[in-house]
């Protein structure tokens, strides 16, 4: 999506990106918590779109560049919906919204093939505007109105759209801007920061009002910050589009950091650096709390070292702890005491962030007292890239600043 001739400008403050403030926005100077339910795809929440508002389940996705919603359109025909979709699919019916305006003539038709929504089938969308309603806010938002061009009648998706929270770079038009960013630029949100809490077990769910997580829009809760927040400038690299999330045209809007150190306990592991779009060398930490963010990020070599430490043996699991392409191993759970924490450092600070063994080891539910690693690898050999998601965030507060283009991390105070 982004010609290399202007890559140098991508990390100019996001406030300079093209976003036309609109008078069709309510002003709200507090934050709002999206209540998250964990699913096999990622975290889901209900959001209302249109006038009157149609409340639908959305996948909250740190790695998507806009507000995507399934509509009635099938091969451009709003009356042929179920020629493309399952009859149980929950959809946004744009024909019932008095504020829906199709703006495809202005922005152009959106089309990604391949993509990480439907993989080998194309993701196609018209561009439109409508009122997005979250809490007391209502913002006239540019959205991606899905226009299906393949048959997906076999089953319904458990959500109706994607609430994208990717960073916005200079030159990104509104069709690929996070709806939160559009709302902040329109004055609906006082703060450009969004934050995430993962309430991963029954002991922590009270913090999330009984839900599995909170995605806070417009700030963070200072009472849950233990110590200081460490802020890191993000980097831009096309390597993510090659090794991790493959789109054509390429998508490079990620909350990604330069990973400067990865160690297993005190054993430092080799880094395999790639070239970023400003010419620097970096191993990459990409933040993603959907299904691709499950599992502690490790290198292939690091995974081999963990296997050696506990004498693990290869195993085929019917219900693996994550959907990574790496193999899985089992070992005697008593050997978990031999495992050290995994440690990561990012450019801008020498602070090491840990994933302790109890958060990357899982007991197999087969009554054999066997355990497996919940880890995920990308690439070959040394550490080139890792996805930092819910496994990393179990005991941390993760924040994104849309104005400064920074990732903030703090220990979480329960």
From Swiss-Prot:
Alphabetical list of Gene3D superfamilies matching this protein: Acid Proteases
Q: Does the keyword Ribosomal protein apply?
A: no
One Pfam family, short name: Asp
Question: Which stretch is the leader sequence?
Answer: 1-19
- Record keyword NADP present: no
Which GO terms fall under molecular function for this chain's record? aspartic-type endopeptidase activity
Known InterPro entries for this protein? Aspartic_peptidase_A1 (IPR001461), Pepsin-like_dom (IPR034164), PEPTIDASE_A1 (IPR033121), Peptidase_aspartic_dom_sf (IPR021109)
Which residues are listed as membrane-spanning? none
- Write down the EC number: 3.4.23.-
Q: Which residues are glycosylated?
A: 93, 102, 140, 151, 173, 202, 221, 258, 272, 335, 366
Occurrences of domain Peptidase A1 (ranges): 43-410
**This protein's UniProt keywords:** Disulfide bond, Glycoprotein, Hydrolase, Signal
Disulphide bridges, residue numbers: 333-371
GO term, biological process aspect, one = proteolysis
In the record, the note on similarity to other proteins reads:
Belongs to the peptidase A1 family.
This molecule's function is given as: Aspartic protease-like protein; part of the gene cluster that mediates the biosynthesis of pyranonigrins, a family of antioxidative compounds. The first step of pyranonigrins biosynthesis is performed by the hybrid PKS-NRPS synthetase that condenses 6 malonyl-CoA units to an acetyl starter unit, to form a 1,3,5-trioxotetradecane-6,8-dienyl-ACP. The enoyl reductase (ER) domain of pynA is likely to be functional during the first two rounds of polyketide chain extension, to generate the saturated C-C bonds of the alkyl side chain.
**PANTHER family found in the cross-reference section:** BETA-SITE APP-CLEAVING ENZYME, ISOFORM A-RELATED (PTHR47966:SF51)
State the protein's name. Aspartic protease-like protein pynH
Q: What is the lineage of its organism?
A: Eukaryota, Fungi, Dikarya, Ascomycota, Pezizomycotina
